[in-house]
Swiss-Prot record:
Protein name per its UniProtKB record: UPF0303 protein BamMC406_1480
NCBIfam families found in the cross-reference section: PRK02487.1-4, PRK02487.1-5
Stated family: Belongs to the UPF0303 family.
Pfam families per UniProt: HbpS-like (PF03928)
């Protein structure tokens, strides 16, 4: 895995995966799409979609644990703070040889810079929330969210997927 290349690719994902508008009905549709995809693949994950301050969709699939819910919360907090994907922030910290606690004073008990939370961006409004998955390895959590967003927005996932490691 090339961190610089992944960071560039994640930036392209964040630029491309923008909703023209977003409301609770769209959150429900996206959440159900993610639930169906995870169920078909046998993923034991938690799925969370929020606008900042308002939960819109949550599901814990068979095999997910309360620990996944806490990972969701901590990854979601990273997106809320930085307005970037949690994986991008984690890779930046890895590249810098630093932690969120060291560099930004953010406690790891509340912020997790691991893959799986992605900014919910609306054209003309910016980042308004996050879409999060937890239960797979961090890169797979990130890509699961990106794949679902591509399907929801009619984008070609193959063109936006991270390089295979």
């Amino acid at each position: 895995m090339d961190i610089a290349h992944d960071l560039q690719s994640i930036g392209a994902q964040e630029q491309a995966l923008v909703f023209p508008h977003f409301d609770p009905a769209r959150a429900w549709a996206l959440g159900n799409r993610m639930h169906a995809l995870a169920t078909a693949r046998g993923h034991a994950i938690a799925i969370d979609i929020v606008t900042f301050g308002q939960p819109l969709f949550y599901a814990a699939l068979a095999g997910a644990t309360p620990d996944n819910a806490d990972w969701v919360r901590r990854k979601r907090n990273v997106v809320a703070h930085f307005r970037r994907s949690s994986y991008a922030i984690g890779l930046r910290m890895q590249q810098a040889g630093a932690s969120l606690a060291d560099k930004h004073g953010l406690p790891l008990s509340d912020y997790s810079p691991h893959g799986g939370s992605f900014p919910l961006t609306v054209a003309g409004a910016g980042v308004i929330g996050s879409i999060t998955a937890s239960g797979l390895p961090q890169r797979a959590d990130h890509e699961f969210v990106v794949e679902a967003l591509c399907a929801e927005l009619g984008q070609d996932y193959a063109a936006l997927a991270l390089a295979r490691s």
